[in-house]
Regions:
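N-terminal secretory signal peptides
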Residues: 1-31
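N-terminal export signals
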Residues: 19, 23-30, 35-58
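Active-site acidic/histidine proton-transfer and metal-coordination neighborhood
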Residues: 41-42, 46, 159, 173-283, ...
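C-terminal segment of N-terminal export signals and the immediately downstream linker at the start
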Residues: 53-94, 98
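Acidic (Asp/Glu)-rich catalytic clusters
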Residues: 80-85, 117-122, 143-166, 185-197, ...
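Short, acidic/polar
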Residues: 103-120, 179-191, 311-318, 356
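Catalytic domains of carbohydrate-active enzymes, especially glycoside hydrolases
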Residues: 111-133, 196-197
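Acidic/histidine-rich catalytic cores of soluble enzymes
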Residues: 230-348, 353
Length: 405
């Protein structure tokens, strides 16, 4: 992969003997020498290239220690400005979905929305992103809180524990043109979002799974229409990404047997979506983990003329160029994997190699973006306390991030 130049890095060595091609690569990647050399060794030994772009030593601390304060002294990683202010530290509740779904009558662990809110607030979180409004039937409020009454109850608990709802992965109509039924359901979810005090409402899926421009044009028309409805209710509508959405759009070259293009101009799908949607009504939530998977997987394309061209995705660069379009992030981490085809295995935030210090330093606007901790794998069938315990580890590591001086 070709590296991107990272102007935020200032800790590169100055020994002339180290200023060869490998040192230039290391600097541009924003990787410490030890990590760079070990990664290069692993790549040389393996059949599949390991992802190195954005890699950095993990921020994991001893699991018994916390870093929930915004102090700027002490350890080396505490020097400089806090990268994620305390009131911007959030978590998507999908990460602790086993806890909200747990039967409070069968466990002493926090169970249901109210007790989970209480525990997350104790960890230090100030924001949450919903992933639906269902919990265990024995929890206060009952199984479904997807109603005006349920939203008012949820809001009261959020207020009790000093939490703010910042978004939801919820209902996005499947119909297009919109049916009356879907439109009314969508408006009901906007009403719930307003009761909960959300600025944003969205989805956990991509606008479309297609690789073709025509389908992305349809998706843009639909999202523009939905975004206008949401804006009238004071809500910013956002979409999400997995790795495929930052793959390359097929928009030219020879046609296949169904009349579809087979080659690319080099524009990525969600980059095209950014261009053809109205910035006043459509926003995006970057899942930074999946964006790095896309960086690993989609680093070259076949151009219209049949040539192969290299183009390494730069997630932080895309956000920096479109900062106000990305009010939300999913912040989840990964360790290098050369066997799963993605380049990374998910781990709790701060215990992997994705360089969040550099990412947040480069995108800036720390009082605008809302990073939500996510770990798809935190719930455990054998360790019911794991997801909330790892939520604390992730919070501490998010709070520990400091901008380099």
């Amino acid at each position: 992969m070709s590296p991107f130049t990272d102007p935020s890095r200032t800790d590169a060595g100055t020994d002339p003997a180290l200023d060869g091609p490998d040192e230039s690569l290391r600097r541009s990647l924003g990787v410490g020498r030890r990590r760079f050399l070990s990664t290069c060794t692993a790549v040389a030994a393996g059949a599949v290239a390991a992802p190195v772009l954005g890699a950095a030593p993990a921020l994991a601390q001893d699991r018994g220690r916390g870093h929930g304060h915004d102090h700027g002294h002490g350890h080396g990683h505490d020097r400089g400005q806090v990268l994620v202010p305390a009131d911007k530290r959030g978590i998507i509740l999908y990460t602790v979905r086993d806890a909200t779904a747990r039967d409070p009558l069968a466990s002493d662990l926090p169970s249901g929305f109210r007790e989970v809110f209480k525990q997350l607030a104790r960890h230090g979180y100030r924001q949450v992103e919903f992933a639906g409004y269902n919990q265990h039937a024995n929890a206060p409020g009952g199984a479904s809180l997807e109603s005006v009454k349920g939203a008012k109850l949820l809001r009261s608990w959020l207020d009790d524990y000093g939490l703010r709802a910042q978004g939801n992965h919820g209902f996005i109509p499947s119909s297009w043109p919109l049916t009356t039924e879907d439109t009314e359901t969508f408006k009901k979810h906007l009403e719930i979002a307003n009761i909960l005090g959300m600025d944003h409402m969205g989805t956990g899926g991509d606008p479309t799974g297609s690789s073709y421009r025509a389908d992305w044009d349809v998706a843009a028309d639909k999202w523009n229409a939905l975004g206008r409805i949401a804006r009238r209710e004071g809500i910013k509508l956002y979409t999400h990404n997995h790795d495929g959405a930052y793959g390359f759009l097929l928009d030219g070259g020879p046609l296949d047997d169904q009349g579809r293009p087979t080659r690319s101009s080099g524009i990525r799908k969600l980059e095209y979506f950014l261009k053809v949607t109205d910035p006043k009504v459509v926003w995006l939530e970057m899942d930074i983990f999946w964006a790095h998977v896309a960086q690993y997987k989609f680093h070259s394309y076949t151009a219209h003329d049949g040539s192969t061209r290299k183009d390494v995705f730069d997630p932080a660069g895309l956000v920096a160029r479109n900062n106000k379009r990305y009010p939300l992030f999913h912040a989840k981490d990964g360790v290098v994997s050369t066997t799963n085809g993605m380049g990374y295995d998910m781990v709790p935030f701060g215990t992997g190699v994705i360089d969040y210090r550099t990412f947040f330093s480069r995108v800036g606007e720390r009082n605008y973006h809302n990073p939500m901790i996510e770990d798809d794998n935190s719930p455990s069938a054998t360790d019911p306390a794991q997801s909330l315990r790892e939520a604390k580890i992730s919070y501490d590591n998010l709070a520990a991030l400091r901008k380099r001086c």
